[in-house]
């Protein structure tokens, strides 16, 4: 007795050719000196589970999952797992291209990262019989739309704008009070105010005296624990000033 392992193809099909020879050592009118026989035997098909191709994903955006089926009659159930979340992508479908939008709420499980890793599992059915399951890791990124919500209130820390209705060159100091909150579990980590080459940090930030006059642009940047940023841009009017000569 001898065991032989035969590899099946991607459809689970295989065949083998068997042959045998017999030699008697003598011959007569009733007995041949040798015999040989051969034949091809088709082996039972081993059902193959389907495979899944997963692209890079962005939470909240639709993407296409591609299914490769060993048999056109097979159907599939696809589920996902991500942190504390799980759900069904498709239920017993025969489609080979499946649109899926990973929920944006999954970002709650990665408050300190801009990308995360989950698992997609495809279970293959022939009729009502489950043939097997395969799991695939996927990476999904948090979209820029999940950056902090922020507003800013500006004033003149030196008080000149209250008197003159505008900021004053080399006298006024720009003060920015920024109110912000993170989205989907993220926390606000940083605030930066920039104007005319000056910078200041913090939710309440005050620059040095403004060196330029005219319509001057400012930028307030709010960064969260994922590294996502919201940028607030605007302009202020700065009156020219020269010290008496």
Task: Name the predicted role of every residue range.
Residues 61-72, 80, 174-182, 245:
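Aromatic/hydrophobic beta-strand junction motif of beta-rich domains
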Residues 53-61, 156-173, 245:
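Short, solvent-exposed loop/linker segments at the N-terminal edge
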Residues 3-15, 104-118, 206-215:
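Surface-exposed, short loops/turns at beta-strand junctions within beta-sandwich domains
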Residues 89-98, 194-204:
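Short beta-strand segments within Ig-like beta-sandwich modules, predominantly Fibronectin type-III
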């Amino acid at each position: 007795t001898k065991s032989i392992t035969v590899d099946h193809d991607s459809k689970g099909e295989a065949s083998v050719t068997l042959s045998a020879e017999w030699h008697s050592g003598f011959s007569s009118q009733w007995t041949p000196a040798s015999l040989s026989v051969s034949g091809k035997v088709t082996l039972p098909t081993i059902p193959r589970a389907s495979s899944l191709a997963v692209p890079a994903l962005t939470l909240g955006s639709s993407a296409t999952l591609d299914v490769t089926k060993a048999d056109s009659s097979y159907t599939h159930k696809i589920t996902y797992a991500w942190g504390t979340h799980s759900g069904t992508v498709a239920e017993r479908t025969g489609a080979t291209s499946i649109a899926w939008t990973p929920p944006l709420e999954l970002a709650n499980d990665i408050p300190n990262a801009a990308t995360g890793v989950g698992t997609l599992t495809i279970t293959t059915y022939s009729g009502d019989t489950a043939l097997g399951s395969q799991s695939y890791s996927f990476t999904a990124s948090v979209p820029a739309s999940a950056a902090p919500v922020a507003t800013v209130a500006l004033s003149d820390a030196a008080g000149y704008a209250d008197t003159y209705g505008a900021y004053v060159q080399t006298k006024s100091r720009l003060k920015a009070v920024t109110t912000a909150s993170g989205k989907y579990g993220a926390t606000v980590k940083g605030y930066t105010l920039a104007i005319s080459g000056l910078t200041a940090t913090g939710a309440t930030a005050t620059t040095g005296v403004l060196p330029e006059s005219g319509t001057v642009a400012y930028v307030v940047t709010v960064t969260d624990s994922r590294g996502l940023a919201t940028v607030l841009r605007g302009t202020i009017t700065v009156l020219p000033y020269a010290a008496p000569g």
